[in-house]
Each structure stands twice: as structure tokens, then as C-alpha cells.
């Protein structure tokens, strides 16, 4: 993550990271240089697939005045009486604009019931994620030993090409998502 952050920041661009699968329990991208972290809350954060939602976490570390692609942060917003987000909110300009202008224009407000359900899920996230990870590792190891399986992708496996990176960024576990292929392809699955 920090290599991407270095390149992005050298070019005065923010680094956005989708942290839906590992969740904040297993990976904290801001600690590695990400400026904005995104989550689909209807996955692990929710915990019971009862509500749709998303989450933006702004680190407050990015200087939006230096970004050549985000000039709207530095220009007057006529829909808010000429408000200039970078002048009023500094490094929190992005999240302020997302809350004020984007939420108003697109309607990204979660219903109270969905917010309640999300909160219930978040309360147990730290308990559920280790179990998701250990279960996924067990399934990945089983699939790896199955003669009908051509390949298995799961960064928790020691022989996975991303295992070292997963250990660095997600030392407490990766996630519960596994991908694999059947020998013989789609014709064998019918």
C-alpha cells in the first residue's frame, strides 16, 4: 500500500483503498499511507446481510489544494453560497464535500433501521473476523488437497504469491473470500 501511496502522493493524488474484505479488524490502510478508505458495509461490517450501505473514512492527511484533478475542492461551490471546501475545512475538505454536497445531490443517507442493523453487526465484528479467516483457511486447504481442483487463491495459504504481503498488511488474518478453479473448467461443473 505504501508504494502506491508514494506514487500517488508524488503526483499530488489521493490514494483510495477499498477495505471491504479485510475490514478494519484485519487491515488499517491509513496506517500504510491511504488517504481515503472505503467499505461496503453490507458485507462483513453488517454481519447479517440485512442492510445495504457504504462507508467513507477520510484520514484527513491529504492536501487537496495540491491535487490537479480535484480543483472543485478549491473552487467556490455556488450551491453553498460560494463555500470553498479547502479554505473552510482544510484537509477534511473531501469528507465535508461528500457529506454536504454529494449526500444532498445523490441521497446517500442510511435509514435509521439500516444504521441500527449496521451498528449491531459492527459490535461483533472483532469476534467474527477471526472465525471467518480460520474457516476460509480450512476450506482453502481442503480445496488445495482436492484432486478435482485446479487452483486455489487465498492469501492466507503459505504457498500463495501474496502470502507475505497479506502477513504484512493483515497480520491477524485476511478475510473469508476464496477463489478456485475446477479441473476441466466449466464443462466439468455441469
Residue ranges and their predicted role:
Residues 1-145, 153:
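Conserved PLP-enzyme active-site core in the AAT-like
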